Amino acid sequence: MAAVGASATLLTNTKSAEEPVRPVANFPPSVWGDLFLSFSLDNSMMEEYAEAMEEPKGQVRKLILDPTMDSNKKLSLIYTVHRLGLTYMFFKEIEGQLDRLFKEFNLEDYVEVDLYTISTNFQAFRHLGYKLSCDVFNKFKNYDSNTFKESITSDVRGMLGLYESAQLRLKGEKILDEASAFTETKLKSLVKTLEGSLAQQVKQSLKRPFHQGMPMVEARLYFSNYQEECSRHDSLLKLAKLHFNYLQLQQKEELRIVSQWWKDMRFQETTPYIRDRVPEIYLWILGLYFEPRYSLARIIATKITLFLVVLDDTYDAYATIEEVRLLTDAINRWDIGAMSQIPEYIRPFYKILLDEYAELEKQLAKEGRANSVIASKEAFQDIARGYLEEAEWTNSGYVASFPEYMKNGLITSAYNVISKSALVGMGEIVSEDALAWYESHPQILQASELISRLQDDVMTYQFERERGQSATGVDAYIKTYGVSEKEAIDELKKMIENAWKEINEGCLKPREVSMDLLAPILNLARMIDVVYRYDDGFTFPGKTLKEYITLLFVGSSPM
């Protein structure tokens, strides 16, 4: 399998009963080695950063609450705070301001306002859950031809803002569908003529719009550009840099902890065929929530996802069909007594898996929150059964229909395991009601799950074919609907695009649950985009993920 949660490949032919022929994956080794094991947390430095943040934090709070500030400037400030990853620090203040500004909104007030300002205001509202009408962009279209005015192409900042705004579109917002295509084409043609910070911003946005990027990385990239702006608030820039450096120390310590745990578990010795991807998995989980209060949650979710990598690569790159059947049965039983029935090489993993979950359940039972651990465990059992089904398909040469593939493929995408495991350490916000909402499989969750499956398939299907993997969504779509490969990929991309619109809708007020619970769902879709937009970034992490890990964990932000 090329990705965490992709389809499994199992060879069943053997040379003899004692010497099975196994798949050969030849996964690239870790590019990091033991680099992050050597980190030593300087608590005094963290305290210094925390203390140093207090003054600029107070100054930024005053700016947000300033009653004399023009509404456009206020929305620009709020948008910048959000881009810098600081919204959680001022959530109540920002929500109070946006409540007031949204109630006061009048389309007529925007008649003389420029495209850049309107785009900034639109994003400030939409990113934070307020459904500002896309009619604010109507004035930039020709009424006779219903096309965008060519005059806006001279306003590069405005076009960039419109392009970013279009990523927040909902179903039926045709003007934003058109805006996305129009601005992308124009910006691509102009980018080579631009210079300085603006050129960098356009390149970054075309590569990956902010809305589909990893929040921590986007914040780091944004303050590098923000410091070049003449209208910047120095207190906000200072806070952003201190905040980044503070988080970096905390997160490097978390990465050291999970790296040491991985080494102590000796998985690379007992299951040497697996991918060694500790920093990459930690990065993935960090993409779900970066706030300091979720430190324990990140450590727990990283460990569980690393368990998933071992399981996945065992099904995909080592085990025979007979061994997979035995392992699946053992995971369904979830009983140490089942260890004798599974191959010896996977027994250490099985014991550690059961022990870690038992310890987690014991710890959270004291807080009355063991149900989140149980939900994670059940998701782990589900994915084992899903992997087995794909293995049986591969073993028999069966290509599933697209609906049949998707029913199982949404399970084997690993989305359910990762998303439910992300809840385990989040604390009191994961109440019984919150878990019940999650288990109801709401539309936003379905949409994020679909992106996880299909984005992976679109990027990895060729590699999967070359390795003799079971059929992907691309293959299933071709078989079911009798279309060409290109047509199948185009249709899957449309499904992904529509799923993003459903996620956008699900994040708007009124919400069924708090944004604290919605954010990991949104951010997991974002991380799928990060990992699979241009390549299989997990199996071959030497490009995007290496760049991100270097940016976040190697070297601090210059003050």
From Swiss-Prot:
Q: State the Gene Ontology BP annotations.
A: diterpenoid biosynthetic process; sesquiterpene biosynthetic process
On cofactor binding, the record's note says: Binds 3 Mg(2+) ions per subunit.
Entry-linked InterPro entries: Isoprenoid_synthase_dom_sf, Terpene_cyclase-like_1_C, Terpene_cyclase_plant_C1, Terpene_synth_N, Terpene_synth_N_sf, Terpene_synthase-like, Terpene_synthase_metal-bd, Terpenoid_cyclase/PrenylTrfase
Per its record, the protein catalyses: (2E,6E)-farnesyl diphosphate = (+)-(R)-germacrene A + diphosphate
Enzyme class at the top of the EC tree:
lyase
| Gene3D superfamilies with a match to the protein in the record | Farnesyl Diphosphate Synthase, Terpene synthase, N-terminal domain
Q: Which residues bind Mg(2+) 3?
A: D456, T460, E464
Q: Where does Mg(2+) 2 bind?
A: D312, D316
Q: Which UniProt keywords apply?
A: Lyase, Magnesium, Metal-binding
Activity's sensitivity to pH is recorded as: Optimum pH is 7.5.
Q: Which domain of life is it from?
A: Eukaryota
Q: Would I find Magnesium among this entry's keywords?
A: yes
Family membership: Belongs to the terpene synthase family.
Q: What does this protein do?
A: Sesquiterpene synthase involved in germacrene A biosynthesis. Germacrene A is a precursor of several sesquiterpene lactones.
**Alphabetized PANTHER family for the sequence:** GERMACRENE-A SYNTHASE, OS04G0344100 PROTEIN-RELATED
Q: Domain notes, please?
A: The Asp-Asp-Xaa-Xaa-Asp/Glu (DDXXD/E) motif is important for the catalytic activity, presumably through binding to Mg(2+).
Q: What is this protein called?
A: Germacrene A synthase 2
| Source species | Helianthus annuus (Common sunflower)
Q: Which taxonomic lineage does the organism of this UniProt entry have?
A: Eukaryota, Viridiplantae, Streptophyta, Embryophyta, Tracheophyta
Annotated gene: GAS2
